[in-house]
Amino acid sequence: MPGPQRRGAGGTGAAGGDNRGGGGDNRGRRDNNGGGRDRGRGDAGDRSNFVERVVTINRVAKVVKGGRRFSFTALVVVGDGDGTVGVGYGKAKEVPAAIAKGVEEAKKNFFRVPRIQGTIPHPIQGEKAAGVVMLRPASPGTGVIAGGPVRAVLECAGIHDVLSKSLGSDNAINIVHATIEALRGLERPEQVAARRGLPVEHVAPVALLRAQAAGVTA
């Protein structure tokens, strides 16, 4: 009788082997989850289609009971170079992590910018806090006449010819957000005409309408 009991114990051991096999299956499922992370990295590869500009990186400190805790902030502008742009602000203990957070926030703030022949439809001014940015259309070949923070936003938005001037605060955060406010305020000739109840010819130059009819708008 003791012998069969040992064989029964051996059978139980076999069942335990099956359980370990099940554990192997679970490990396989964890590997599948890893595949999900690979898909996430694939999405990260798709981000190469976007233009990312780090405008400024600052080190900040928080005073706590035990001393100071340092971290980094990053102001990032992201666009596709074809009329879509957004700005984000990230904060983390390491610079790469702060930039990554800024990029993700910028993508959540994407919006479309009206363009005609690589420039803006009309002059406009944007304000944010003490920062003021003035933008004016320019003829083809002029280039982007702008300072660092303004240039980063305009180039990410796909604007190739524009004149700009920054007034007031020289803080990069204020300047970037003032530029974003200016771009958000841009309107197409059709939108202005509809708001005023006038024909399009009465609110836009003939050359602008010809360029728009030629299919060079965005």
From Swiss-Prot:
Cited PROSITE patterns: RIBOSOMAL_S5, S5_DSRBD
UniProt GO MF annotations: rRNA binding; structural constituent of ribosome
GO cellular component, one term: small ribosomal subunit
Region (Disordered): 1-46
Record key words, sorted: Ribonucleoprotein, Ribosomal protein, RNA-binding, rRNA-binding
Stretches assigned to the S5 DRBM domain: 50-113
GO biological process, one term: translation
Ranges annotated as biased composition (Basic and acidic residues): 26-46
Residue spans of biased composition, Gly residues class: 8-25
Annotated disulfide bonds: none
InterPro entries for the chain: Ribosomal_Su5_D2-typ_SF, Ribosomal_uS5, Ribosomal_uS5_bac-type, Ribosomal_uS5_C, Ribosomal_uS5_N, Ribosomal_uS5_N_CS, Ribsml_uS5_D2-typ_fold_subgr
Function: With S4 and S12 plays an important role in translational accuracy.
Family from the record: Belongs to the universal ribosomal protein uS5 family.
Description of how the protein assembles with itself and partners: Part of the 30S ribosomal subunit. Contacts proteins S4 and S8.
Domain notes: The N-terminal domain interacts with the head of the 30S subunit; the C-terminal domain interacts with the body and contacts protein S4. The interaction surface between S4 and S5 is involved in control of translational fidelity.
PANTHER family noted in UniProt: MITOCHONDRIAL RIBOSOMAL PROTEIN S5 (PTHR48277:SF1)
Protein name, entry field: Small ribosomal subunit protein uS5
